[in-house]
Amino acid sequence: RAGFLGGVTGHVYAVDGISFSIAKGETLSLVGESGCGKSTVGKAILRLFDITGGQVMLDGTRIDDMPAATLRPMRRRMQVVFQDPYSSLNPRMRVRDILAEPIRNFGLAKDSADLEKRVGDLMDRVRLPRDAVGRWPHEFSGGQRQRIAIARALITRPSLIVADEPVSALDVSVQAQVLNLLMDLQDRFGLSYLFVSHDLAVVNLMCDDVMVLQHGQVVEAGTAKEIFQNAQHAYTQTLLAAIPGYSK
């Protein structure tokens, strides 16, 4: 916080005192209104910026203070799916190249035939036709673009995926399809999700555990059943009351 003549009068933390763990194959949701710090937590875990205190552990290894060269192979084990599938995909690249680029960068394919097979397998996993790899991102619907983004996140076989409002930009009818896909992939590959959302109706469908943030701090945490059936904090109760047709 800046004071008179540019002096520092204090520090404001975007998030503070947050601690959690996510078991293999489970989903933890961070929920709260815009600006509460939930996306900041996801970015901190992904090491998109450095934290000023605390620790981030991935599969038992501390990564928050890890040098960039050491961190690179660890990045294979954590991926992200962003809110807006269109802005997260390069509009100048065909889908084949969007998926092939990280496969090449990580040296995952033995040869060109193996590369093509891997790209095709990814399309199968997200239930898109293989022959669509020659198309551009703008030729797909929003839900299809998000499937492509999910396919890209699967390339390195991560143990953790940070899903930052992954369906909030989609029509309600498409949201359910994408959420079902995420849950099916979780069952198949044992994925852990950090699911960032402001939509508690979606969270109730998707998540095992819930952490409610307000002004960068946790106000309530528990299993999804505990939160949705017996919320204790007034802020959580307000969020739940905003769900159309909500009842315990």
Annotate the PLM regions.
Residues 1-245:
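ABC transporter nucleotide-binding domains
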